[in-house]
A protein has these predicted regions:
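Cationic, beta-structured binding surfaces that engage anionic biopolymers and membranes
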Residues: 1-154
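C-terminal single-pass membrane-anchor helix
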Residues: 160-197
Length: 197
């Protein structure tokens, strides 16, 4: 059955994000994301995925032994994940490209099965989108359309985790830049108000 939406809700216990799927009017809880003692996991379909993501451009999710210990990957085209304009995701036999249209708006495209084949964004098939506007980081919402609705649920859940990480790394990098700017600006403001400048 096609699934048009994956949503993450605000955690009730402070560290476990419930993950929902389905029509916005009738969503079912399908999994949960948590970070405990610096170990990130997604519990989905009775399985626990081990998640690996840092500042680098590579993310990995390894499913449990019950599902064959599959490795889903997302690789950005920048030095860091937050600086990547395009992220190539491979989950099972499905390939998806996440393209950052702006700092806050992202589009999912169906990628060619050959990883070396170039993707023409003008003619590529759009299969979904997400944004960090209106609390999008806290309440992740990935909307699928067309072929994206027919992706397996585990692939959609993986893409929602990649979406959350893409938004989170951009927020952290912009916060870091703003903090550095303010640290440099403060001495000049103090000197200005004291009349030395």
């Amino acid at each position: 059955m096609p699934n048009p939406d994956i949503r993450w809700s605000v955690p009730s216990d402070g560290h476990t994000f419930p993950i929902y799927a389905g029509l916005p009017s009738d969503m079912d809880r399908v999994g949960e994301y948590s970070v405990e003692r610096d170990v990130a996991t997604i519990r989905f379909g009775g399985d626990t995925w081990a998640l690996q993501a840092d500042k680098g451009p590579v993310m990995k999710a390894t499913t449990g032994e019950a599902t064959g210990s599959q490795v889903f990957t997302a690789v950005g085209d920048g030095k860091t994940f937050g600086a990547s304009k395009n992220v190539s995701c491979t989950a099972d036999r499905h390939r998806v490209l996440i393209h950052a249209e702006s700092r806050k708006d992202f589009v999912l495209f169906r990628a060619p099965s050959d990883p070396d084949a170039p993707l023409d964004l003008e003619n590529a098939e759009k299969i979904g989108q997400f944004t960090s506007e209106n609390g999008g980081l806290k309440n992740v919402h990935v909307s699928f359309e067309g072929a994206g609705e027919k992706l397996p649920l585990d692939v959609q859940v993986f893409l929602s985790w990649v979406a959350r990480h893409a938004m989170e790394t951009r927020v952290l990098s912009s916060t870091w830049r703003l903090s550095l700017f303010l640290l440099v600006l403060i001495p000049f403001l103090v000197l200005y108000f004291l009349g030395y400048i």
